[in-house]
């Protein structure tokens, strides 16, 4: 089915509707799973030596010093234009503003007289950021990960990226307070961060996108007792646009293509109650495709994408909630009125002047988002991902005495005698003191 095929949702059977919202299949092949497992074990056993061997094998690069020197970072900074540096500074300021506002106030309540309960927040002590290499370095992801890590107060923030690391990535790391940068890419970088080597420190949690090998490596280390936690499950990028008859077709098309150009497994969907809007968007997509350097990639993504005509905007919202897109763009009159009806989306963009690109780079929200349907249970990345919450309770003698019989009754009902005894012994001690 080509992207210019306009689909009438209400003419489809329930099974056809289900198929329309199916995402392109993703699963690690057995060979990838085995290869990644071998890489993890090898890096854990042989450390830096294994990292250098993998760099030669996969990156075709001889790495002498795994850690990037301060001189190299300074030289990278010199090579960048002032215009780009200023743009990064604006983006970081907005990201800082939004993520600082996410700080939770401490919770300190007396649940009943003499029973004090608190919730306090602490940073994750050490985090590792993975940034892919390639022809289009994702330096914006450095800003999105390192900025909240700094605000959270993480004591150690390190970054791995395949050599040679782009100047933009090195400068962004310095700008956002990353302490150490390492010339390591792929599954071997995830292994190094999870287990530690002579050069790369072991971290508590790993963040960042990557290819199938990186994704599988993150999955595997997150399930190993000696591994590390990860940010969230990863999947292909996606966008869903809800547009009414008043939307601008060129704007809608550009937003759809901005996701389609990410990769051939990306998925884009247009929902509109106006059949004429669907037709005009399809035409605009074709016009804009002709001008894109990554047109072939975008065209492959469009093969799994959809133009769907609905009964009304309420049905658009219903379908969107069922799909749960990574990015949801609402280009309708009074777009904000629909927000309260949205239940599942990674990030929402309202109105003609809120392109998804704004959130990707500089509005201040985070561009690391749940995808592949994980919006049903996962949140967009934020300050909380770099923190952990801890509860504290303190009972006075009076508070304990008032609550003791309740605890004893509940513990006895669960047949946990030692739990009950821990209370009964204290009750008896208080009686002896009286």
UniProtKB/Swiss-Prot annotation:
UniProt cross-references to InterPro entries, sorted A to Z: Ald_DH/histidinol_DH (IPR016161), Histidinol_DH_CS (IPR001692), Histidinol_DH_monofunct (IPR022695), Hstdl_DH (IPR012131)
Co-factor binding details: Binds 1 zinc ion per subunit.
Binding positions (substrate): 237, 259, 262, 327, 360, 414, 419
Keywords, in A-Z order: Amino-acid biosynthesis, Histidine biosynthesis, Metal-binding, NAD, Oxidoreductase, Zinc
Domain of life: Bacteria
UniProt GO molecular function: histidinol dehydrogenase activity; manganese ion binding; metal ion binding; NAD binding; zinc ion binding
Annotated CDD domains: Histidinol_dh
Matching PROSITE patterns: HISOL_DEHYDROGENASE
Binding-site residues, Zn(2+): 259, 262, 360, 419
EC nos: 1.1.1.23
Biological pathway: Amino-acid biosynthesis; L-histidine biosynthesis; L-histidine from 5-phospho-alpha-D-ribose 1-diphosphate: step 9/9
Catalytic residues identified in the record: 326 (proton acceptor), 327 (proton acceptor)
Cofactor(s) listed: Zn(2+)
EC class (word): oxidoreductase
Catalytic activity: L-histidinol + 2 NAD(+) + H2O = L-histidine + 2 NADH + 3 H(+)
GO cellular component: cytoplasm; cytosol
SUPFAM superfamilies: ALDH-like
GO BP terms: L-histidine biosynthetic process
NCBIfam families tied to this protein: hisD
Reported function: Catalyzes the sequential NAD-dependent oxidations of L-histidinol to L-histidinaldehyde and then to L-histidine.
Record text on subunit structure and interactions: Homodimer.
HAMAP family registered for this protein in UniProt: HisD (MF_01024)
Family: Belongs to the histidinol dehydrogenase family.
Name of the protein in question: Histidinol dehydrogenase
